[in-house]
Every structure is written in C-alpha cells, then in structure tokens.
C-alpha cells in the first residue's frame, strides 16, 4: 500500500545516508503494515459448470429487477475475458460494441487502458441480455452496462455477495467450502491460457507479453506469477481444458 511505499522510500534514503557515514534511522521490516494476500483459487471445469448453472438460476429480486439477468452475464464476461472484477461491474454501455464484440477497458488499475474482443458466443449472450436492459425504463439513463438499482454500478461488496450466493448454491449441503473470490475467475482464465500454451508446446515466457497486454498487467512479474501457480494447478485441477470454456456459454438461438 501507500504507507509501505513511503517506508521503503524513507529506508532507501536512510541506507544511503548510513553508507555515506551520516547518522540515520532505518525502519525494521516488522514496522511495515501487514497486508493479507489471499491465495488464488483455480476452479476446476466441474466447479465452473456448477457455478454458472447457479448463476443462470439466480433468483429474481423485485428491489433489483435486472439483477438475475446481470449475474449470469457479468461473471461469464469476467471469466472468458480475464477481467478484474471492477472492470466488469463498472463497464459502461459506450465501451462495449455488440456488433464487433469489442470491449474497451478504461479507468483501470495502473491506468493501462486496453481493447479486448469477446468470443462470438459471449457476444450473443450479451446481446440477449441487452434487450431487457434497454427495455427497463428505470435503467435507461444509466451509463453502466450492468446497472444497480439507482443507475450506478454495483458496489464491490454487493458484487461479492452475489458471487458468494452463486458459489453456495452451486455446492448445496457442502460445509467448509473453499474460500473463493470473483477475482479467482481471472486467475482461472490466466491458468487456462497457460495450460493451453503448455499443451501446444509453446514457450511460455515468449508468450507472456501477449497475456500481459490482454490482462492489463503493469509489468511481466504480475503475469509470471501465474506460471508459478501452474504445477499446483495441474495436480489439483486435472480436468482443466481450454475447450471446456465453451460449455459454460449457453446456446443463444438466432431469434432470441
């Protein structure tokens, strides 16, 4: 965080002064605030199928009449495009082109705007969702593609609660479920891409710049992190196949 960066800068100056023979104080490592970093959870194909089936059956809420239609679409968008949760829930109408499938991701972490293209099946899903969204008079003035009641985008907490509701519904009667976050959909996306490249015998480090650009990482170190997850992922998630991504996109007929 910001405080940790400030302490690092002060320590750097202190170490320089000490090296030149001046008196200076250097903060001990224990002084920096501890920041919890949850371990990424990589969903199996079976878990994803159950999760999206639960999203498809998300209950209707009269206080939020569009929510049950938003949930199945926004979580698929985050997963299949590898978005950060905030990029999905705060997506604006003017930044998604349902004719070309292009999605402009802006106002992002590290200010790295990027243009991505959705799968054709996902474009069809978004078009089907856009019909009731556009017809809902209470949301017409909202600039967001996934509007919450009142026209703003969903808060981070509300978004997380909807995801947890889907996760629990996907695993009825199971106690002590693994702790998962919306962000884990992005982790699974990256792992699936790397798994595919591994199967294709590609040089992962040569391909990393492409994944880095697509996911909007600031530098390669963030992208390299997913390679370190791969061995554990391959052991625990033996059924991870890239082609299985297609199975979570519901078929949309031409007239729907």
Question: Which residue stretches match the model-derived regions?
Answer:
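Conserved catalytic core of the tyrosine transesterase superfamily
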Residues: 1-256
């Amino acid at each position: 965080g910001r405080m940790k960066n400030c302490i690092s800068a002060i320590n750097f100056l202190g170490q320089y002064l000490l090296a030149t023979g001046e008196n200076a104080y250097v903060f001990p490592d224990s002084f920096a605030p501890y920041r919890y970093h949850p371990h990424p959870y990589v969903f199996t194909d079976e878990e994803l199928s159950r999760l999206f089936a639960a999203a498809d059956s998300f209950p209707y809420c009269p206080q939020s009449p569009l929510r049950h239609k938003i949930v199945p679409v926004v979580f698929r968008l985050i997963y299949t495009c590898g978005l950060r949760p905030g990029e999905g829930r705060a997506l604006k109408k003017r930044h998604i082109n349902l004719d070309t499938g292009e999605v402009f991701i802006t106002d992002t972490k590290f200010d790295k705007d990027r243009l991505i293209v959705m799968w054709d099946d996902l474009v069809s899903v978004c078009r089907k969702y856009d019909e009731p969204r556009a017809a809902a008079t209470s949301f017409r003035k909202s600039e967001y593609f996934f509007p919450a009641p009142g026209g703003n985008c969903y808060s981070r907490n509300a978004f997380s609660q909807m995801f947890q509701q889907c996760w629990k519904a996907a695993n009825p009667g199971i106690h002590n479920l693994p702790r998962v976050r919306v962000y884990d959909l992005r982790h699974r996306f990256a792992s699936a891409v790397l798994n595919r490249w591994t199967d294709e015998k590609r040089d992962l480090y040569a391909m990393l710049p492409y994944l880095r650009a697509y996911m909007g990482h600031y530098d390669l170190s963030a992208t390299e992190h997913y390679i370190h997850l791969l061995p554990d992922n391959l052991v625990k998630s033996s059924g991870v196949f890239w082609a299985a991504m297609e199975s979570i996109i519901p078929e949309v007929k031409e007239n729907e």
